[in-house]
Every structure is written in C-alpha cells, then in structure tokens.
Amino acid sequence: MVTRRALHFVFKVGNRFQTVHFFRDVLGMQVLRHEEFEEGCKAACNGPYDGKWSKTMVGFGPEDDHFVAELTYNYGIGDYKLGNDFMGLTLASSQAVSNARRLEWPLSKVAEGVFETEAPGGYKFYLQDRSPSQSDPVLKVTLAVSDLQKSLNYWSNLLGMKIYEQDEEKKWALLGYADDQCKLELQGIQGAVDHSAAFGRIAFSCPQKELPDLEDLMKRESQSILTPLVSLDTPGKATVQVVILADPDGHEICFVGDEAFRELSKMDPKGSKLLDDAMAADKSDEWFATRNKPKASG
C-alpha cells in the first residue's frame, strides 16, 4: 500500500495578481484555499522572510488526490531572482493550451503537441495539448541535479521513491511514489545547481508516525535537515507536523503528517473570495509607487 503522496510545489510570487491570472485563467486551475499570515513561518514556508505573507493553493481538484501549486506571496517583495534549479512543471490539458491562445499568453512549441510557457516570475510550464489520461492533469515536476547517481540514491534509497524510467546517457530519471501520482523528474546539468532567491520547495505527506523515523534516518546518513520536526499552526485550521529536508543539491523537501494535513487541506469554498479580497486590499504596490520606490527583490 502506498503511504506517501506527492502534494505540491511551492512557488514564490512577486506579482500576485498576474500569477493568479496565469494559474486560474490560463492553466484553468481553481483556488482551493487561501490563508493570510501576519508573521513568517517557523519552517520558512514563505522563504527567509519574517513579515506578512499569504499562501494560496491552486489546482485542478481537491488536494487529497491532486498535485497542486502553493503560491507564496511576501508583502513588499516584488520579484525573486531565478536560479537554474526548477526546470518546469508538465501538465496535460488541451483546455490550458486553448486558454493561452485565447488570452494571447505566449506559447512556444517545443515538440509535437507540447508547448512551453512561463508563469510570471519566469517559472517554466510545459503544456501537452491533449486530455489527461489520469484524473489529475499535472504529470511531473522537473528539478535540476548535478550528480544523477547521488540524487537517485537519495530519492530512491533514502526517500523510498520508485524509479520509473532512467537514461544514464541523458542524465535523466523519472521517479514517483505511485503510478497515479505526479512524478519527480531529475535532469542532470553541467555545473552546480543554483537556487538563487526564487527557490521553491516540493512537499510530500507520510503517516505522522513516520516523521521521527525519517528525521533519524537523515541524521544517521548525515543528510541535511533544514527544519527538525516541528508543529505548524494555521489560524482556525488543523495543526500539522513537518520536517524539512534538503537533497544533495539543496532542493528543499517538506514531509508533513498525512492525517492532519488532510484536515488542513480541505477545500475552502470561500478560498477564491478570500484571495480576491486580499488582492483588492493589498495596497503595497501603490504605497511603493507613491513614494517612488521599487518593491524589494527577494
């Protein structure tokens, strides 16, 4: 029985309005929940920032059985410098391709039936012009690695992912926890992986009782633990336990206790309105404009 699930990828966003337009109107995702926070997260969910921030979960369906995007917005930060760490998110949706064309969102054809586009901030998305063969159109997240064998040892032997496909020559591998889940694609690159300021985080869930064992395993293997096991509170919602790890290239990985996360991640029918209200109330762009100052870079 599969006990681990691929949950979401965290994107830091500088322009919340444009980003929401991309995910909602171009990709066709829906707002699943929206949360506002007055101070930084204990597990650095919003990055190394300690001010006011928001989290918006968007996806093609409920978080219980869809891989979704977490859009993290730090008030006062206008952009984040991109590294070479995140290489793209691939989804199968003819609707997204047709939405992009209708809205004149830039698309470039990279293969037969596959189009590359960019979310605000420069994050790459690959849209396959076809209907998804599974219930979730999100197929894979691609991350850059500097040493494929070292990465495979980490993700497969330590984190227990199945290797679905690999090509030594092309320095490429596809991994996952289950056939019907979003996959992780590792792509070897020349040189070091640069996370810069825009670096994201990939999240998985496991039974809560496995979290201390996972942390102990990483200690024994002398692997990086960015945030030891900690409880995270969300106002008015379930408290979850998480441990934050980093792979050999420094990609951040969150493991969260599944039972509490299923409670926390329940779809909020008011999510879209909460987001729209927050965007309408966000005067940070105007505040900086009237003072002739640019927003800070991440």
Curated annotation (Swiss-Prot):
PANTHER family: GLYOXALASE DOMAIN-CONTAINING PROTEIN 4 (PTHR46466:SF1). The modification Phosphoserine is found at residue 131. The modification N6-succinyllysine is found at residues 109, 273. Keywords: Mitochondrion, Phosphoprotein, Repeat. One of its GO terms (cellular component) is mitochondrion. It is found in: Mitochondrion. InterPro entries: GLOD4 (IPR043193), GLOD4_C (IPR043194), Glyas_Bleomycin-R_OHBP_Dase (IPR029068), VOC (IPR037523). CDD domains: GLOD4_C, GLOD4_N. Its main location: mitochondrion. Belongs to the glyoxalase I family. Residues 5-130, 137-258 form the VOC domain. The keyword Repeat applies. It comes from Rattus norvegicus (Rat). Pfam families: GLOD4_C (PF21701), GLOD4_N (PF21207). This is Glyoxalase domain-containing protein 4. The keyword Mitochondrion applies.
